Curated annotation (Swiss-Prot):
Protein name: F420-dependent glucose-6-phosphate dehydrogenase
Source organism (scientific name): Segniliparus rotundus (strain ATCC BAA-972 / CDC 1076 / CIP 108378 / DSM 44985 / JCM 13578)
Role summary: Catalyzes the coenzyme F420-dependent oxidation of glucose 6-phosphate (G6P) to 6-phosphogluconolactone.
Binding site for substrate: T195, K198, K259, R283
Gene (UniProt): fgd
Family note: Belongs to the F420-dependent glucose-6-phosphate dehydrogenase family.
Length: 335
């Protein structure tokens, strides 16, 4: 089984204020995108010019202004500053308001968003992953059962009921940057999320084989798992803009350890601004030729990544949406 190509738009919540971002999302639906995803940050990647609107409030506004696109998080961490029962309630409400259009993308989190609101020490991966598994289990119980009594290592409910919930549970997409969580996505995720630009071997040797392994372990058809990849694409007919638009997002080019451990946007910005442009641009597909873009994206679709969500780094998002629809969408849908 293989799923059809879907084209999505990444609403850059760390770059734009919530009103701008809603309007860009409405425009994305108008320009033919199939989905819109948003990250859920308490703090942005950079202090200067950064934004961090609350994803849950924002999704409600977007749901009311759109009628067709799938909407969801990429990603939200339901484990520290949130109680997963509250996230279950929130997404059940979204599911009632926008049936069939909502998904919850989850990950193990970043210190940047948790320590600012009181988490004293950033836990090791083992605890973060255990919390994620437990939170997903609890949320699914709350979406399908009543009077849930849950006694986990980290979370507990007593006769808990989500009173307003859709007839079908909210799809949970699991974000992974390594084999351990990717195997979990294959076992338990309705969808899988990863990001582009991290070296071919990560996808061919680690992530996708791990998703397959996890699915095989529980007798699932991995081909039926919606495999979403956030593609970092700086496309513009003007080559100078295509390159220099990536500068705002230089923090994405920091090491995984830096991104997971730094807790201050000012520190993140200082570390990122010290990076050379060549290193910043390496995380992105930087191009002015649409055929070059399609050829590079074909690498991912050939691996079975079917849900292509495009993150454009420039400040002129309407320009990106227009040139994407004109130059890229028809070519990508034919892959």
């Amino acid at each position: 089984m293989s799923l059809p190509i879907k084209l999505g738009y990444k609403a850059s919540a760390e770059q734009f204020n919530p009103r701008e971002l809603v309007e860009y999302t409405v425009a994305a639906e108008r320009h033919g995108f199939d989905s819109v995803v948003v990250s859920d940050h308490f703090q942005p990647w950079r202090y200067t010019g950064g934004h961090a609107p609350w994803a849950l409030a924002w999704l409600g506004a977007v749901g009311e202004r759109t009628s067709r696109v799938q909407i969801g998080t990429s990603v939200l961490t339901p484990t520290f500053r949130y109680n997963p029962a509250i996230i279950a309630q929130a997404f059940a409400t979204f599911g009632m308001l926008y049936p069939g259009r909502v998904f919850l993308g989850v990950g193990t989190g970043e210190a940047l968003n948790e320590q600012a609101v009181g988490l004293k020490e950033w836990p090791e991966f083992k605890e973060r992953f255990a919390r994620l598994r437990e939170s997903v289990e609890l949320m699914r119980k709350l979406w399908t059962e009543e009077r849930v009594n849950y006694e986990g290592e980290y979370y507990r409910t007593v006769d808990a009921t989500v009173y307003d919930k859709p007839s079908e549970p909210i799809p949970v997409y699991v974000s992974a940057g390594g084999a351990v969580v990717a195997r979990y996505a294959g076992r338990a995720g309705d969808g899988f999320i990863c990001t582009s630009g991290k070296g071919a071997e990560l996808y061919t040797e680690t992530l996708l084989p791990a998703v397959q392994e996890g699915a095989d372990k529980v007798g699932r058809d991995a081909g039926g798992i919606d495999k979403l990849i956030e593609i970092k694409l700086s496309y513009d007919p003007d080559p100078w803009l295509a390159l220099n638009n990536t500068r705002f997002w230089s923090p994405l080019s920091l090491s995984a350890e830096q991104k997971h451990s730094l807790s201050d946007p000012k520190q993140m910005e200082e570390a990122a601004d010290a990076l050379p442009m060549e290193q910043i641009a390496k995380r992105w597909i930087v191009a002015s030729d649409p055929d070059e873009v399609v050829e590079k994206i074909k690498f991912y679709t050939d691996l079975g990544l079917n849900h292509l969500v495009f993150h454009a780094p420039g400040h002129d998002q309407l320009r990106f949406l227009e040139v994407f629809e004109r130059d890229l969408a028809p070519r990508l849908r034919s892959l």
